[in-house]
Structures are given as C-alpha cells and as structure tokens.
Amino acid sequence: IGRALLSEPRLLLMDEPLAALDAARKSEIMGHIERLRDVLGVPIVYVSHALEEVTRLADHMVLLADGGVVATGSAVDIMSRPDLSPHTGRHKAGALIETQVAGHDDFGLTELAFTGGVLRVAGLDLAAGTAVRARIRARDVAIATTRPSDLSILNVFPGRIAEMHPSGAAAMDLQLDIGVKLWARITARSAHELGLVPGREVFALVKSVAIDRHSLGLAQPPNRN
C-alpha cells in the first residue's frame, strides 16, 4: 500500500488485501485503510469475500456471483435486502446503521446516537461526534410486543413490523422500522405465538455485547465525492 501511494494514484485497487492475516492484525490494518480512505480521498476498489471487511469499509457495494452482477447500491441498502442473504451470508444477514458518538458512560460503554435512539456498545476510544457505522445481525435482535422491564438488555427500540419473510424451514425474518431499517430473525413459532403481522408495533431488543469491534467501523465523511 505504501509503495502504491508513492505513485500518487487516482484510484487504489485492493484485491483481498487482508486474506492472509489473523483477526487482530486484520482489525489493525482496517483501521489504517479507513484513515487512508478518509484523509487522502483516493477512491478505493476493495475486493473481498469477507463481509465484515466490506461492510466496515465500503460506502457502495457491487455484489458479484457466478461471474455476473447480482446487485449494486449503497452498503446500507444492500445489507437491508433479505433476498440477497444467499449471497451475503444467511448467518451474517442484518442491517447497517449510521451513527455518531454521543458520549461514554461510567460503565465502559459508548453511546451511539442515530435516528432511532441511542445504541450502547462496548467502549470505543473515539471523540464525541465521530461518525460510526454499526452492523447489527438479524440473529442478535429479539422481539417483544410490550416494553420489557427488569431486563439486562440495554438497547430497546420501539418500532413497527414493515415486512415478514420466511427464512428456511423454521425461521422468520422481520424488517423493522425503528426510524431506520433493522432486521430480526426469530423462529416461525415465536412469530405465530406472538401474533406478529406487518404493521404491528413491537420493541426490538439488541444486546450490547453482541455488537463487537468487528461490527463497528468509522463511517465515511458525508461530504466526500
């Protein structure tokens, strides 16, 4: 990367640059790539099979399969489409949420403000106002039909079921409107027993510890071309 930058490129092509690295080194290098993206302003074409890398670094995605383009659009939109989960990974399906650091509490948590409220995650060494993109996996979201009390889960967001889609033989994917799009994956039995239907108001529950550092990345500055 250093040698490439010395030539003052107009565009950088990174083809699986982190494939041979362990998780700790990947996270470190991704931080450097984020800073390159934001400080130098050089467009980067980033090729990878690792969804966590792409969702952390990219603002625009082109999804390829069998030699052709399956979908193209913003990373937020692509990750919000359940029909693409066979390509993006059913186990990793979820939503991307653009947030800003609102502050830090006395218990080692960072508060990330977004349209739907405040998302509390494990502490980040970032200043207030820093833009952060959070990836919330559908399997990490639970549903309640009434606001819960005496609960260890800190992230509780009121919202409405926008869509419901069967996912495999026993699961149901719910698209929730909590001010932004959020996905929840629950069992079809739970959906039936709770009487869930599109339009119903519910509460989305997200454990803070389910959102690890690999699910968070510095968002691209909004005014870049």
Where do the protein language model's features map onto the residues?
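Catalytic Walker B motif of ABC-type/P-loop ATPase nucleotide-binding domains
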Residues: 12-16
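Internal alpha/beta loop-helix hairpins
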Residues: 34, 38, 48-117
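Hydrophobic anchor residue at the start of the ABC signature
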Residues: 1
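Glycine/charge-rich catalytic "coupling/switch" loops of P-loop NTPases
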Residues: 116-165, 183-225
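Helical segment within the ABC ATPase nucleotide-binding domain
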Residues: 26-40
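Short coil-to-helix N-cap segments within the nucleotide-binding domains
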Residues: 20-21, 36
